[in-house]
């Protein structure tokens, strides 16, 4: 046997007689694969023959036992050089194959393990009854059996089943005999039960049928109460009659074409998860299984089989029942329950799971009178917490866990005036067994005494700590037990080192650690602490070279070329630090003129040295309303002015805003904990004076410090906790037991694990322990929300009395000092604009008089009066006026502004120019004499659809307008809903419109609306798969989905609304409402955003939606090209309306352009979905186009609803429900009271029709039926989930028709504008190659799309090519890119041809395109080299241009220029 195999045999302790067996004579280890994360050692052995089974089993046992001692697992595979074997040996291995792995499935094993097998060549014959001859076993199990035997050294078998009729008959007879016994036993049991019942039951009061079918059915239903439950994680293959118990986390019902219902649901028992499916006859039967719902606990029985569709194991459920699941409860009596003062919500970035509502609800459920929230560096959970606490009737204490830093970290300690160049320095370093001067030991002190850059003496002593060094210490420092075993005693080394350092300046890299360690040891041995000057080269480097990212000893020595042979051995570190010191001294004198030691702290420390300062955690709580505003200021400052990697709060800034705040000492990252561990109780008492209370946490929270070897063991950890309590007692400050909550339930730990590990090893929390193959991240603490009794158990080591004081008494007492605060205002606070009310009223009437005359028609006058009463009475005038000012400024820059949402429901908004949608009932009006005529009977859905008519007074052609939209849909029935005015500005003009807001209201009052980005479902799925890969896990699909659900929703980043701007009233400041920050922590951003998600404060402050949109840009481009005023374009143009019914108006056939209508490229109507709707409905009026717009944007309004009604001929496009406002208008025309019509509309549009009480719904239905509203209309209401506002539809359709007007009447302008603004992808070679090439490329992409193989770019390109194809079919062409004619970003018209811009070329971006045009204006390009240099083009782009024939005969180099240079 080989040496390696012999060593393994010795290690395993294999018996001598086995080692000498002939089978092992030529044994060899071919290779060993070590899976570090899963701790699996995979051996690959080579033997001369297949091993005798007894040797195989001994080897297997030895490997298993030996490796399990170290927490590892060993598996092995065998190759046999000779594969000769007897059927007897085969039979032995055949049985062994079922002992583990995929063949251990209970169903497969029970049928197959005891069968007889034989081999003939590579065929393995298995003899058994008919029961084993199943396709399922052949397909899914026999291949696994063959693989298992191959691992034992056998050849690759093809497994065949041989049916044995005798065995089949024997099995059937045994089954029937067993079945008869079961039936007989059941009957006897039933008879005994009936006899007992007859004896117990009273005589029947009345006769009943002799046979009760329902009773029998109920009795026959299987009970699962006593069934054996199988943990889901144990099921890896198909098995029958298994019972699972778990919680449902996903449910979906599907109705098949035959009417059967499939209930797909997923359950977890927290060991793993499983997909389930339950078939039922019909929807009525499905209602009996409504117990299958999210968060319900079920016990289910069924067969686990491979689902051919999902390719995953799925249980086909036969029986199920709901079970009562034990929930953790707080078992302490009322009045003796704790208050949690340290809980994180999902707003702690990538760190914690629960929404604040869950924390509040859990505390309330457990009977806790209060709970505190303390997210990392932010307060984004405050608004939701405020509402949740009010709802739950519990006190919420508002706090955060802040990152505190020192403003100025000294370079020199104990500074004196001294010439830096004349001082003698002792540059020293210490090596220790840990970070604590109290609990760890010095093991080496080394120093270099230096003068003028030269080493004049050296000190280097090891110290025996009195115990063996840990592997971690040896691995880190290189110091072994041999180094220290004969070393001097510590006290002697300390005395000698003090003597060595006399009359010198001490120097260390990260001096606070080294000096702290030395002082603690000096003090312990009654030696004087360090009093001479100390220079910290770490801070020296940070202030001298702030541009460097890393200032550790390793990176600095590498940068300056200083030798560092053995980092973390004190003698080498000390000498390297000394070399760096003299480089720094020279540099600081030359660059900063500093030559005196005492001036280093004065002249060199940077004002932003806080950026590199060490962060310490502290918990800050809001005591009162003053404190709330101060914490808002601190959050703002830390996220803006002092942001560096994380939000930082300099100590002096905290001091300046401390009024109304309470400070806690936080976790193990807090400075009190740190100083207790590193310097002891006395030092910690001084530090703790800064805080109002001291936090101690359960040992389980601190436990990872043991794994990191920062704390020796649990006993030392308990000592540290006792020391923290002593600190509080000495100062008379309360000590509170807090839980550092990061999730609610213990089983949720895995979700946080997945989130945290997704951050990678760059995150501090994921820093690995150990080195090389043993490196792994430290475990995370058990940070679930603990009940009072659980918390008392954690602190039982303190004794009952002290534990109760920390857990219950102190937390409740501290909670009493917090006052109630108003986090979210109860009212709307709009900015002040002088005379806003008068201006809005004046502008409204001025425009109304101009259009409708003075006096106004009653219908106009009453509408204005109604609206102004609401707008002015509720303080909304400033919102209207601000929007009007923004629109006016954009109009003056030459852009139309489109409205969104319901603002078009307001006639005042129309009159002052915010929207062009006129919400009055359809009407005529004369522009000459102001004659008007209103149609109020509902006969027209839009004024644009009325026939043309001349003025009866003056003969002038009448204008037509009015979309019949009630004002109530904008501000509510009582007109007191805060208006949400959304405006679509041109994307080109949007930045200017944003600056207009600042200009109108002031920069300090205008902020972008902030958003919070959380981990999305797909991202969470990726995190789970990454965790699975990195940590050697194997999850089935259902478990991946469960874990992804648990990991989703955690804050990941912040952002800003694309157009939302929040305006703070100028008589208040932003901190009255929200903190501020930069989006995504980008401190270079032009705008600050609200810290709170803008939805949390949108009812308190004005939010303007200044959005960017392509439509206004398109209209501006078309106006520039044509000179046509877009406001003069008619809304009832016959040619435009013809687009919706065919292609004739374009001069092409449907076959030419691949669609039956002319909708391609028309906003709102050009998508495949809407084009299909157009094909089905053939709209002919503006009102019907509004219907289409509403139907296409709603949910369950078209599909399965209006579409079916139209197909069945029950209704047509004009009568189905399309927009939300239609419901109110239709019902009022039908005769319902306006209030009821409005309420019905609100219930339907929000999808609440089937969710309201049956009594309320029946009341509405009766009223509708009484007014002859048809049954189909009422049923349609019940299906709707969401509806589009009519005003929004009207604004969009008006813009769309303007664009369509140019497509019909000015096509070259239309195509130029479309490709310049809307097209997303180009292939200019194809676009210019003619129809045949274009159509062929479209077919290629279409085929890819059918197979889901098309990329997003190709999908966008297909849309472009549809328009390109149409343009060519209409007789227009594309030219080539022209180096001297093409524009940077816009297409150019040349007769009937479009010249593409440079950005249409693949790989050529907008900035380069603009640079190329600028360079072209400077003069002709004489060579390709010059084109690359002046035009900023890459060689690849120049080559592409040359291939496309754009460069003509341009030479590679400019020969004339070369000639000029020579002479």
From Swiss-Prot:
CDD domains per record: DEDDh, PHP_PolIIIA_POLC, polC_OBF
Alphabetized UniProt keyword annotations: Cytoplasm, DNA replication, DNA-directed DNA polymerase, Exonuclease, Hydrolase, Nuclease, Nucleotidyltransferase, Transferase
Catalytic activity line of the entry: DNA(n) + a 2'-deoxyribonucleoside 5'-triphosphate = DNA(n+1) + diphosphate
Main location: cytoplasm
GO molecular function, one term: DNA binding
GO BP term (any one): DNA-templated DNA replication
EC nos: 2.7.7.7
Subcellular location: Cytoplasm
UniProt name for this protein: DNA polymerase III PolC-type
Organism in which the protein naturally occurs: Streptococcus pneumoniae serotype 4 (strain ATCC BAA-334 / TIGR4)
Gene: polC
